[in-house]
Amino acid sequence: MNNYFLRKENFFILFCFVFVSIFFVSNVTIIKCNNVENKIDNVGKKIENVGKKIGDMENKNDNVENKNDNVENKNDNVGNKNDNVKNASSDLYKYKLYGDIDEYAYYFLDIDIGKPSQRISLILDTGSSSLSFPCNGCKDCGIHMEKPYNLNYSKTSSILYCNKSNCPYGLKCVGNKCEYLQSYCEGSQIYGFYFSDIVTLPSYNNKKKISFEKLMGCHMHEESLFLHQQATGVLGFSLTKPNGVPTFVDLLFKHTPSLKPIYSICVSEHGGELIIGGYEPDYFLSNQKEKQKMDKSDNNSSNKGNVSIKLKNNDKNDDEENNSKDVIVSNNVEDIVWQAITRKYYYYIKIYGLDLYGTNIMDKKELDMLVDSGSTFTHIPENIYNQINYYLDILCIHDMTNIYEINKRLKLTNESLNKPLVYFEDFKTALKNIIQNENLCIKIVDGVQCWKSLENLPNLYITLSNNYKMIWKPSSYLYKKESFWCKGLEKQVNNKPILGLTFFKNKQVIFDLQQNQIAFIESKCPSNLTSSRPRTFNEYREKENIFLKVSYINLYCLWLLLALTILLSLILYVRKMFYMDYFPLSDQNKSPIQEST
């Protein structure tokens, strides 16, 4: 009987112990979570205070810089008289571009928004006009390189509020805010509201900073490609339409009258550079001037779009020879072959031919094409694409051990091709060299060809104004994908031909807004790996402490499970000790005499 009450009493005590333990653990958990949250808030406040201090320092520096602007502008006016002969690097503002065609599918730069500033990564897009990015409070935005822009952190931000129909520039009033809405040809759409703030461009080569106020779009909804891109926003570089929101590039040159209204883009396989105020002659390939003269002489002797002087195929040692020559390049603007921009607000130019092995495969007399750094690939009409693809397919050999297939290609004659080539022998030589060097080719999605090497692949030649033929090398119209080089051409969409990034690559594309013209100069563009990009306080850190991202209910359950596990172990241990004390083994009740008998 006594044992029974003892057992009951112990289990009651044990139950109380379990209850108190669970209550204690749960409260400790909540307290710890609150402490973590408070620490995060304190860190955020400290960062905000540091940002404000930085902003005050920047304002002081701006005042000092503004005092020197008058003196510098006077010097600029004197220097501008000699700028027609030479572009001085000190007068240029250079900005590093990051990204590539394969992994990112775009190139982007970093600019500062607000006072104190918050860094935002923006895709460089000459095919659009808006400057926009996600803002704090957006529930339909993706995870990008930086956290959404926080308007409350900036002392200079101002939302563009409205009352039914008083929005400027013909904008719509939605929810007492002027609506921002942008649609793109690939199907992406973003919308939100407009706000104004200070835009600052920190140049890596020039201590002076370009800064001005700009009306920008705050994303409250993203979809399609924008939802999954790594860069935070978009920076449009096209021109202002009548009665439209003033664009970035127009405001930039309006607030820096000392600069020439010229900018250039130079991208390599990884990264590149944006140059404001001119272009960089030092990047020109050393034999560029010789090439232009040679091409002009070739064009003067051409007939009906076919070049009479033999255009060589891309050779393995071309780049080595170009770099080894020590030829002085003239910096005179007159040596650059300019192309007129054919439309008012976007960068369209006319092309008059596209040559492959000396044969013009374009069936139209001319074609308007958009020069667009926001498009990854170059989009051409379907008939031109099919012609190029036909010849590249012949040069694409999947299995070097398939003797039947190889012999079949080697037996091709010029008459058996869809369109005879002017330099058919060069085509056959390239095919033989590809086979001999085992330049294997594979096909990826949508039949896109990829070669292991650029060797013996053909150059393309684009005919521009004044019958000037510009070389388009495989290192440009193909892009690096792991250990292969893949075709960067696609069929046009919505009847809109585009010269995309695969045309920009390894060229300095110069936009002269004063003369309304564009030039393409083969250049050795700088490389900037994304891994070398400076870090910032407002970046999105993917490797944060995982426990800070777990919800409180999940964290509570985790602690509860741990507590129950510990308590269960204690119960089993106490139970074992209890039975050992109150229920001794039968052998323990026997006397020593009984055991001996």
UniProtKB/Swiss-Prot annotation:
Residues 58-83, 289-323 are annotated as: Disordered. The keyword Protease applies. It is a single-pass type I membrane protein. CDD domains: Plasmepsin_5. It is found in: Endoplasmic reticulum membrane. Residues 299-311 have a biased composition (Low complexity). Residues 33-88 form a coiled coil. The keyword Hydrolase applies. This is Plasmepsin V. The transmembrane domain is essential for localization to the endoplasmic reticulum. PROSITE patterns: ASP_PROTEASE, PEPTIDASE_A1. It comes from the Eukaryota. Keywords: Aspartyl protease, Coiled coil, Disulfide bond, Endoplasmic reticulum, Hydrolase, Membrane, Protease, Signal, Transmembrane, Transmembrane helix. Residues 1-551 are lumenal. Residues 58-75, 289-298 have a biased composition (Basic and acidic residues). It is an enzyme of class 3 (hydrolase). The chain crosses the membrane at residues 552-572. Disulfide bonds join 135-218, 138-141, 162-173, 167-178, 266-525, 396-441, 450-486. During the asexual blood stage, plays an essential role in the export of several proteins into the host erythrocytes by cleaving the pentameric localization motif RxLxE/Q/D (termed Plasmodium export element (PEXEL)) located downstream of the N-terminal secretory signal sequence. Specifically, cleaves after the leucine residue in the RxLxE/Q/D (or RxLxxE) motif of exported proteins including RESA, EMP2, EMP3, KAHRP, RIF/Rifin and STEVOR. Also, by regulating protein export, plays an essential role in gametocyte development and thus parasite transmission to the mosquito vector. GO terms for cellular component: endoplasmic reticulum membrane. Residues 107-521 form the Peptidase A1 domain. Its EC number is 3.4.23.-.
